[in-house]
UniProtKB/Swiss-Prot annotation:
Gene Ontology MF term list: nucleotide binding
Protein name stated in the entry: Nucleotide-binding protein ASA_3207
NCBIfam families, sorted: PRK05412.1 (NF003819)
Function recorded in the entry: Nucleotide-binding protein.
Organism of origin: Aeromonas salmonicida (strain A449)
Record family assignment: Belongs to the YajQ family.
Record keywords, A-Z: Nucleotide-binding
HAMAP family, per database record: YajQ
UniProt xrefs under InterPro entries: DUF520 (IPR007551), UPF0234-like_C (IPR035571), UPF0234_N (IPR035570), YajQ-like_sf (IPR036183)
Keyword Nucleotide-binding: yes
GO CC aspect terms: cytosol
Length: 160
């Protein structure tokens, strides 16, 4: 029986490239001349550091633009609150990896309510969709692409 997996992953090497591009843009921007500001990637989060809170907001927008250029959706970002320590401001941006239980349940309910003839099963941090016809699976894919679930979804292991 044909099947595929729905996953939510962020490629960290693309995030690294986006952070490097954002740091390069910071170095060339006129409004950041003479300001100590930087992006730093630590495992699964990006640390933003600047002299003022408004600069952090600008840096988040720079990071969003760099991520979009690398085909990473903004909905995969969790932007934390800015923290003031000494004369510096810090902000952490985390990336959503895997599908959380609540979102997986919403996904299963969405597909089952649509009356498409497929079976849906939650398998850890991914969702497996199985059906008799390839057309039913493609219809389920289109349904998931159109749904706003708060994080980007990718499709893997499409088997006939």
């Amino acid at each position: 029986m044909p099947s595929f997996d729905i996953v939510s992953e962020v490629k960290m090497n693309e995030v690294l490239n986006a952070v490097d591009n954002a740091n390069r843009e910071l170095a060339t921007r006129f409004d950041f001349r003479g300001v100590e500001a930087s992006f730093e990637l630590n495992k699964e989060e990006v640390k933003l550091e600047a002299d003022a809170d408004f600069q952090l907001k600008q840096m988040v927008e720079i990071l969003r633009a760099a991520l979009l250029k690398r085909n990473i959706e903004n909905s995969s970002m969790d932007v934390g609150d800015s923290v003031h320590s000494g004369k510096r401001f810090h902000l952490n941006v985390k990336f959503k990896q895997g599908i959380e239980k609540e979102i997986a349940k919403k996904l299963v309910k969405l597909i089952k309510d649509s009356k498409i003839k497929v079976q849906v099963a939650i398998q850890g941090d991914e969702v497996r969709v199985t059906g008799k016809k390839r057309d039913d699976l493609q219809e389920a894919m289109a349904l998931v692409r159109g749904a706003e679930l708060g994080q980007p979804m990718q499709f893997q292991n499409f088997r006939d």
